[in-house]
Design a protein with these regions (language model features):
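C-terminal catalytic domains of large/alpha subunits in multi-subunit enzymes
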Residues: 1, 5-93, 97, 138-358
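Conserved strand-to-helix beginnings and helix N-cap segments that scaffold or border functional pockets
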Residues: 133-134
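Conserved beta-alpha junction segments in alpha/beta enzyme cores
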Residues: 1, 89-118, 123, 127-130, ...
Length: 358
């Protein structure tokens, strides 16, 4: 948001016009202008592109989605079809992850362990249907080696975690998840010390493992709940706050130089559409998306978010339109007048894959 998509579409339009002007395929022009050995590895604002995945991602989608074969088939179709015309495009994206306002790249969390072994987690991120609470719960469950049903992620509230940053900039899980993880690590250290001490092995606390609802040190093993109760009777604190701030960020707004992002996320999308040249009616026939999400915490959520983002972008560029009357009042103000895509507008064939996963 905030002008990013508008800038991106302008750059992509420039690439398309260059391709037409020189009689080349747009994909070939895009590939020649990716970051790399001949084009450089620094952005215009001076940030080094450290993990350049786009060349490999484009090559993979180009092959698996049969770009060149379909390009030939579409050209043949268009020669024979006077009214319905087809189009094909493959578009990459490199998206910086972090707030460009450095102070917003921080998050807090509060984690409580109860004597029945259940855990309550509160963090500063806002759940708006994107699956954030589920991922946060998974992070806590993974740290303690527990099932997700032992974790309760409570509604976000500033009397538990104050001074929360906006849940935006694609950083909600990064920031709040790390804050929760840090709180869990603190609690694990206390529990591990308690367990090792009970065995007379105080110097072995660093070797304690939390696995499958149990706590293990060599041949010694008890359930997580048993250790929690043991810690409670030993007067060990079972509550901790956590904090995280994104590292490596520095950006000079006066010079427009620096490192405003911790890292980049990459994606490649290929769309095949049909357009009725008499009416303007269109259908999205087939979509293939390959997206880099790193080590996915929840592939189902990530794929759903990618699908939703594609449909959202499709609506923005086709049916959605802000309209004002002569008095300056917005008149496309409801679902009847602001045309977001419906279920019938989704691609006939919609394939989303996470890069690096089988």
């Amino acid at each position: 948001g905030f002008g990013g998509p508008q800038g991106m579409i302008m750059a992509e339009a420039v690439i398309d016009k260059i391709a037409r002007a020189i009689g080349s395929d747009p994909l070939s022009v895009r590939k020649r202008n990716l970051y790399g050995p001949t084009t450089g590895s620094f952005t215009p604002y001076g940030m080094k592109v450290e993990h350049n995945l786009l060349p490999d991602m484009i090559a993979e989608l180009e092959e698996t989605a049969q770009y060149w074969k379909r390009r030939e088939a579409i050209a043949a179709f268009n020669r024979e079809s006077p009214v319905i015309k087809k189009g094909l495009a493959l578009t990459p994206v490199k998206f910086g992850i972090s707030f460009t306002a450095k102070h917003l790249n921080q998050a807090g969390a509060l984690v409580h362990i109860y004597t029945d072994g259940s855990i309550q987690v509160n963090h500063g991120g806002t759940e708006m249907g994107q699956g954030l609470h589920t991922k946060i719960g998974q992070i806590a469950a993974n740290e303690f080696g527990l099932d997700l049903d032992m974790i309760e992620v409570t509604a976000t509230r500033t009397d538990k975690v104050p001074n929360t940053s906006p849940t935006a900039a694609s950083s909600g899980t990064d920031l709040n998840g790390k804050a929760v993880q840090n709180a869990c690590i603190t609690l694990k250290a206390r529990l591990a010390e308690c367990f090792a001490k009970s065995l007379g092995l105080e110097d072995r606390a660093g070797d304690v493992l939390f696995i499958n609802e149990h706590v293990v040190l060599d041949e010694h093993k008890i359930t997580f709940t048993e250790l929690v109760q043991q810690a409670y009777f030993a007067r060990v604190s079972l509550s901790s706050s956590g904090f995280y701030k994104t590292p490596k960020l520095q950006y000079n707004r006066d010079t427009g130089e620096g490192r405003p992002f911790f890292y980049f996320a990459y994606g490649v999308s290929m769309s095949e559409v049909s357009v009725d040249t008499l009416t303007g009616e269109y259908t999205v026939d087939k979509v293939n998306v390959l997206h880099d999400v790193g080590n996915s915490l929840n592939p189902a959520i990530d794929i759903g978010q990618i699908e939703g983002a594609f449909i959202q972008g499709m609506g923005w560029l086709t049916t959605e339109d802000l309209k004002w009357n002569e008095a300056g009042k917005l008149i496309s103000e409801n679902m009847a007048t602001y045309k977001i895509p419906a279920i019938g507008d989704t691609p006939k064939e919609f394939n989303v894959k996470l890069f690096g996963r089988k």
